[in-house]
């Protein structure tokens, strides 16, 4: 079997590795001179392909964005600068000797499908034949340019966020950004203290979430857990949104700052930024309404306000596309592509896509688990359902996204990290059984349930399991703390540490007494009432008790977390 991988970025590298683990003849084509994809920073905006900004720092922590059998160095910062991410990808590629399978500076011009194979036409004129093909070119290649009324009057510069690299050339300029996604906020923060003014124009507004959560911990180590997922599933949708909106409102009043959207918190892809509130409050950034029209050197908003503008940066996302593919191989309509589990084309299961997904979480572990699944299917160790079943699953997923998210073409490839990882892991056979682990090692089972759902979890069992997975999981709290512990505080060193502290902060006895009484009384009422009252009354009491218990656990999640782990 001969497999072609297109792209040697964060999705291409684990795809190569998955292939060589099963002895597959794999060739990867990379159009740039190095691995890394977006993370391979190329400051020349005319260079081929997309790339990060000079100041880009990831929005997911290192433990949550690691490949499942290759933890990053423990002393690296939790939120890594893009240079660290690129270094990590190089370390991964070197460790598993992946670079020798990559043909650099080689552009795939065209891919055609003939019977049971693919012909890959290269820019240099060569044509290579492959049995299978894995597309790893992502969804940040083709910028989406909006239609703007009256833009012909504007005499300033217009550019897309895709072309932004650094602050050079923006000094002393009036900059307006159209859009309020993560890229828009990163650029606004980057320019805030060197530009004359920075204005963010938003049509809908957004909920702003912080990377650094309670106690200074990375948010994803606290909230991307099986426990949290379970809580969000059992409590009503409205209550779940109220809970998260209350959290973000504590940091910044979204009404006062002009940010509150019409949609609920879970109806959008998270917008993550820790600096925005301070910069708005300090006058470095303005939040404005949607753009209505333009003057020569101004933008005029729909509420009538106008802002000076020398440079307009459109932060309006990207179009999904595969310009090198025949349209009959894989169609893209309305920024949607029909892929089973966002991976396999029902029309041609010899073609698979890795990384064509927008997770609430990191793309790296998701790309890796997709690659593992693909290779097992290619090797006929796993089978796919019928074409009709795959199409039905795709339609179900589309309806779920439309029900949950506000109507936008950017919400066509959304998934929740834990749920999606579990879904694919179940297909592979690498999802751990917590009930089995509970009887063997209750403490470790609790760690898997309450602790961060790190990628190493999916190497405990199943194909290509990793012997170091359990140790890596156990020491995640320590690895999160190590880069922060540059100085030991004298009083803290005298505190007694133990297992209790790992999950609970210093507990007020008054607080414990109060809650203990509530539980005791509630349980007593439920038990003593028995069936002496009506069945309906009894079940109402039971329901009330468990609702109280659930909210108690939710409150625990707010108050007690990993922040005291050594």
Predicted regions and their residues:
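Flavin (primarily FAD) cofactor-binding/catalytic cores of flavoenzymes
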Residues: 1-58, 71-216, 225-390, 402-566
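Post-kinase regulatory C-tail/linker adjacent to protein kinase catalytic domains
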Residues: 389-397
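Short, basic/glycine-rich phosphate-binding loops at helix/coil junctions
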Residues: 63-71
């Amino acid at each position: 079997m001969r497999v072609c991988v297109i792209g040697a970025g964060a999705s291409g590298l684990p795809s190569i590795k998955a292939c060589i683990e099963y002895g597959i003849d794999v060739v990867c084509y990379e159009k740039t001179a190095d691995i890394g994809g977006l993370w391979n920073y190329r400051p020349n905006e005319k260079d081929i392909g997309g790339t990060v900004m000079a100041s880009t720092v990831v929005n997911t922590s290192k433990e949550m964005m690691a490949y499942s059998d290759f933890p990053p160095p423990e002393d690296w910062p939790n939120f890594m600068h893009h240079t660290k991410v690129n270094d990590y990808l190089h370390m991964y590629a070197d460790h598993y000797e992946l670079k020798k399978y990559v043909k650099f500076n080689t552009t795939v011009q065209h891919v055609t499908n003939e019977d049971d194979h693919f012909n890959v036409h290269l820019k240099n004129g060569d044509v290579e034949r492959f049995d299978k093909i894995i597309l790893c070119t992502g969804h940040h290649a083709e910028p989406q340019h909006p239609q703007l009324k009256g833009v012909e009057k504007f005499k300033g510069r217009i550019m897309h966020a895709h072309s932004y690299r650094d602050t050079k050339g923006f000094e002393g300029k009036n900059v307006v950004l159209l859009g309020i996604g993560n890229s828009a906020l990163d650029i606004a923060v980057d320019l805030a203290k060197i530009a004359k003014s920075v204005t963010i124009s938003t049509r809908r507004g957004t909920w702003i979430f912080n990377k650094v959560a309670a106690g200074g911990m990375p948010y994803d180590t606290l909230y991307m857990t099986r426990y949290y997922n379970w809580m969000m599933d059992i409590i009503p949708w409205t209550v779940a949104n109220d809970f998260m909106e209350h959290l973000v409102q504590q940091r910044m009043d979204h009404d006062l700052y002009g940010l509150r959207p019409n949609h609920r918190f879970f109806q959008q892809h998270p917008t993550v930024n820790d600096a925005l509130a301070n910069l708005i409050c300090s006058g470095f950034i303005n939040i404005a309404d949607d753009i209505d029209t333009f003057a020569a050197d101004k933008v005029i908003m729909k509420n009538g306000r106008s802002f000076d503008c020398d440079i307009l940066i459109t932060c309006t996302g990207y179009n999904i596309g595969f310009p090198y593919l025949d349209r009959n191989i894989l169609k893209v309509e309305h920024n949607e592509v029909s892929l089973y589990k966002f991976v396999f084309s029902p029309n041609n299961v010899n073609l698979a896509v890795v990384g064509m997904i927008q997770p609430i979480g990191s793309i790296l572990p998701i790309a890796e688990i997709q690659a593992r699944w693909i290779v097992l299917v290619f090797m006929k160790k796993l089978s796919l359902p019928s074409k009709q079943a795959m199409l039905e699953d795709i339609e179900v997923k589309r309806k779920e996204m439309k029900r949950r998210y506000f109507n936008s073409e950017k919400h066509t490839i959304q998934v929740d990290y834990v749920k999606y990882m579990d879904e694919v892991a179940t297909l592979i056979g690498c999802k751990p059984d917590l009930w089995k682990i509970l009887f063997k090692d209750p403490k470790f089972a609790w760690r898997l349930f309450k602790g961060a759902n790190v990628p190493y979890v999916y190497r405990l069992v199943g194909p290509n399991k990793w012997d170091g997975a359990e140790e890596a999981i156990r020491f995640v709290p320590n690895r999160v703390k190590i880069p922060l512990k540059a100085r030991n505080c004298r009083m803290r060193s005298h505190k007694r540490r133990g297992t209790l502290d790992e999950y609970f902060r210093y507990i007020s006895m008054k607080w414990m007494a109060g809650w203990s009484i509530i539980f005791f009384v509630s349980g007593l009422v439920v038990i003593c009432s028995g069936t002496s009252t009506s069945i309906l009354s009894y079940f109402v009491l039971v329901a009330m008790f468990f609702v109280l218990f659930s909210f108690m656990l939710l409150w625990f999640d707010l108050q007690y977390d990993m922040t005291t782990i050594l």
